Each structure stands twice: as C-alpha cells, then as structure tokens.
Amino acid sequence: MQSRLSWIFNPKTGKTVMLAFDHGYFQGPTIGLERIDINIAPLFEHADVLMCTRGILRSVVPPATNKPVVLRASGANSILAELSNEAVALSMDDAVRLNSCAVAAQVYIGSEYEHQSIKNIIQLVDAGMKVGMPTMAVTGVGKDMVRDQRYFSLATRIAAEMGAQIIKTYYVEKGFERIVAGCPVPIVIAGGKKLPERETLEMCWQAIDQGASGVDMGRNIFQSDHPVAMMKAVQAVVHHNETADRAYELYLSEKQ
C-alpha cells in the first residue's frame, strides 16, 4: 500500500500533479478528448500520475509510458441519466494486472444513490487492502446541491471514514482549510469546468497553500490553448511553491 502511495506523491514535496482524462466514461468524446493519442499523449511526460479508464489504458496509452496510473473503477452511468447511479466497473485483479497505483470511484453524499456509491467505496477499499491497492474517493455533487465547505467537509470525512486512502474534491473559496483539517487522509483538488488560465493557477495556489496535497486536473489542462505550458505552470505551483502570478508568467513564457 505505502509503495503504491509513494508512486503518487512526490517523496520530496509530498504532493502530486495528476492528469485526468477519464471523462469519457460518462461524457463520451468530450472537447479535447476526441483523440487522446494526439491531444493527451504529449502531456504524459509532464504529469506525475495519469488518471484514466482501463479501456483507454489498454487501447491508447503506450506500454512504454513510464507513469503511475490511477484507474477509474466506477461507471455504468452517463450524462443522459442520473449521474450518481454508479457501480464498481473494475475488478481488483485487473487493477493489479494493469499495474495501477490506485483505483478511483465517485461518492455521491446526499444524492439519490448515496448508499450505493458508499458501498462501492467500501467494496474497493476491502478488495484493495488484500492486494495493497489504494482507493481514491472522488466527491461527486448533485446538480441541486450547494458546493460549500459544509458539504465537502461531510463528503470527504465520510469517504475517509469508509477507508479511502486519498480524496479528490473541489476547492471552495470559503473554508477550504477546514475541509483539509477535518479529513485525515490526503486531499487533491479537481479542476472542474474550464477556467481562464490565471484563475486556474490561483485556485491551485490557494488550495496548496491551505493544505491540499496536489491537484487532479483535466479540462483546465487539455482544453487550454497551450496545455503543455499549463502543465508546467501547475507543476511550478504544486512542487515549487510558486505563486499564481509567477506561475502565470511561466505559462506565458512557455506558450511562446
């Protein structure tokens, strides 16, 4: 377990920059992910960890790619129906066979299928403990729910109490440090919808400054006009403690 966790978090900084491109499991070929082999593969070398589905790992990610992989382990839903109605979509045997460093599943606290999503996390944690595979719980939010500190404090703590070793959640401007303080395992932030590059870097800096252990971003990287430059700027914030202003200057210089 600790060995795999050390693949995720840089031993010098204790932090990580994950590149998420698992969106197709419920969104299909969303903007920027139509051709992963063309648009996403050039970004691999600039990430600490990749996050994808086993289908994409097998069919698109080159076998020689020397990066740890977090495998999406929940699915069976789409944007056409209730998003929270997920099932475990990956066996632990396959996760081990594919040499993943962790498995990830959504947890939808307060949603119609809250109970099932928590059971999914428990199932993965139990199976993972037998083979030393960490589980990352990803806090999903229903469309009618308020994205605030109170909600994410509840969701992250429940996921940690169920045994998840890492939590992926959203940054909130008010009270994020309380979310981190109340969660006994590392938190990485999701990027969420596409923002202007300067705003994304500010969000990264604020999250790291308030105790996050890294970022797991997708659209704010691969939908950028200059994704490689954006990856380098995010790395500067997470691992080199650069401010958002300094990181944005780096982004501007790298995009030339």
UniProtKB/Swiss-Prot annotation:
EC number: 2.3.1.245
Catalytic residue list: 168
Any one GO CC term of the record: cytoplasm
Xref: InterPro entries: Aldolase_TIM, DeoC/FbaB/LacD_aldolase, DeoC/FbaB_aldolase, FbaB-like
Keyword Protein biosynthesis listed: no
UniProt key word Cytoplasm: yes
Localization terms from the record: Cytoplasm
Pfam family, one: DeoC
SUPFAM superfamilies attached to this UniProt entry: Aldolase
Single Gene Ontology MF annotation: fructose-bisphosphate aldolase activity
Keywords, in A-Z order: Cytoplasm, Schiff base, Transferase
Catalyses which reaction(s): dihydroxyacetone phosphate + acetyl-CoA = 3-hydroxy-2,4-dioxopentyl phosphate + CoA
Family designation: Belongs to the DeoC/FbaB aldolase family.
Function: Involved in the degradation of phospho-AI-2, thereby terminating induction of the lsr operon and closing the AI-2 signaling cycle. Catalyzes the transfer of an acetyl moiety from 3-hydroxy-5-phosphonooxypentane-2,4-dione to CoA to form glycerone phosphate and acetyl-CoA.
Assembly notes: Homodecamer.
Protein name in the entry: 3-hydroxy-5-phosphonooxypentane-2,4-dione thiolase
Annotated organism of origin: Shigella flexneri
Origin organism lineage: Bacteria, Pseudomonadati, Pseudomonadota, Gammaproteobacteria, Enterobacterales
Annotated gene: lsrF
